[in-house]
Each structure stands twice: as C-alpha cells, then as structure tokens.
Amino acid sequence: MRRLPELRSSYVVNAEAWDWSLRVLDHVDVHASDYAESVRFYETVLAALEIPRVSEGNDWTCFTNLNVADRQPPTQNLHLCFYARQKEQVDAFHGAGVGAGFRSNGEPGYRDYAPGYYAAYLFDPDGNNVEALYRDIGNVGHDASATLK
C-alpha cells in the first residue's frame, strides 16, 4: 500500500474521516501557473467549506477530490462549484478568499438560476471561476428583488 507523504499544512484531517459517499466525481485536476499561490487559494477557500487537504507530493496537492498540480499549460476557463452544507459557509468561503487578497467574481447572495440558489464566486490565481453553492430549500420563495444576477 502506498504511503502518503508528510503533509505541510495545519489544516489536514485523516482521510479516513472524510465521508467518501459524498463524491459525485472521482477527481478534478487543476494545473497551476503559480503552484504555491494556487495551493494557498484553494486551501484558504476550501477550509471554509470543511474540505480538507488530504495528501501532497512535490508538485501536487490533493483536497479530497480536487488535485492542484504544478503542470503546464495551466487550466483556464474552468468553472468549479463546491457544495456548501450551510449558507454561512458560502459567506465564509467568499470572505476568506477576498480577505486573503483573491478577486471576487460575485458576492454571496441568492441567484435566479434555481429556487434557493445561494452562491458566491471567486477567481483562482489562473482566472478559473470557483463557486460555493448552498441550495437553500427552506427559502425557495426568497425575495426576487434581493436576487443577485
């Protein structure tokens, strides 16, 4: 059995503790033009969603199902959407990213894409659109005038 390399992050959980039944994709690879900055971005924003860094190597880092790799050419024009279990996690995702100096692509709020669609968007260092989404089924009749477009 392959042994995981020693991790450098303080935000690491035991991979055994992750609920692997939550997976819909096995994994997604994002190739980064600035590997260290991309790892900083994903670690910052995914911590707000309780998505852990579970393993890493010399030129890759795995956050459960997302692999960030120091590869060329960098991934571009990608839209990644991460599920949030609470509305507050969407707010925390956006706040953590903006607070760390990353660019917003849409503040937290309800969208008219679907009833109860509460989301926020950030650009990763390569310009990919990264979203956190909470499907607020208890608020499907939200005030349309408060909906962000």
Functional labels for PLM-detected ranges:
Residues 7, 11-39, 80, 136-149:
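N-terminal beta-strand motif that seeds the catalytic metal site of vicinal oxygen chelate
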Residues 32-36, 82-126:
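Vicinal oxygen chelate
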Residues 129:
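Glycine-rich acetyl-CoA-binding "A-motif" of GNAT/NAT acetyltransferases
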